[in-house]
Swiss-Prot record:
Protein's UniProt name: Small ribosomal subunit protein eS7
GO molecular function: structural constituent of ribosome
Organism expressing this protein natively: Oryza sativa subsp. japonica (Rice)
Domain of life: Eukaryota
InterPro entries: Ribosomal_eS7, Ribosomal_eS7_CS
Gene assigned in the entry: RPS7
Amino acid sequence: MYTARRKIQKDKGLEPTEFEDTVAQAFFDLENGNQELKSDLKDLYINGAVQMDLPGNRKAVIIYVPYRLRKAYKKIHVRLVRELEKKFSGKDVVLVATRRIVRPPKKGSAVVRPRTRTLTAVHDGILEDVVYPAEIVGKRVRYHLDGRKIMKIFLDPKERNNTEYKLDTFSSVYRRLCGKDVVFDYPMTETA
């Protein structure tokens, strides 16, 4: 029997939470009810989901998708997020690929750590996932005298209409996932 439970696959031995079940049910309903997404969603599933509070009495839904399926999710990202935001009544939906950070190898060991498993690569990948479909066109790091570090991320101005209202959501979600302060902006376009 094909049920919503097949839409979520957790690590061995872990049961999905109640909220994860509702997200899996939403995926299942979209697959069965929405004709344009049906064929695309057939083989896709999620690893987990978390709901978080945002400043200003808003909520965001972070959905973790398998790293290997991220390209398939990116093909339907805009339509899928629009439908999920309707289902979750205005909550901002963010899709993030599940990535692992591996500790650096000990001195003298012959083990080589893949570049994709380093802390920097994982945090950069999460940042790209959070702001998708907009592309990052520039980064600046600002160091305060007290040691704080704030990253300023410039997004592609072509996606301004789709992403401008979500910039606060992006920075809150990234701070929750990576613990880094981030400010999103669009580069100034010169009019000649």
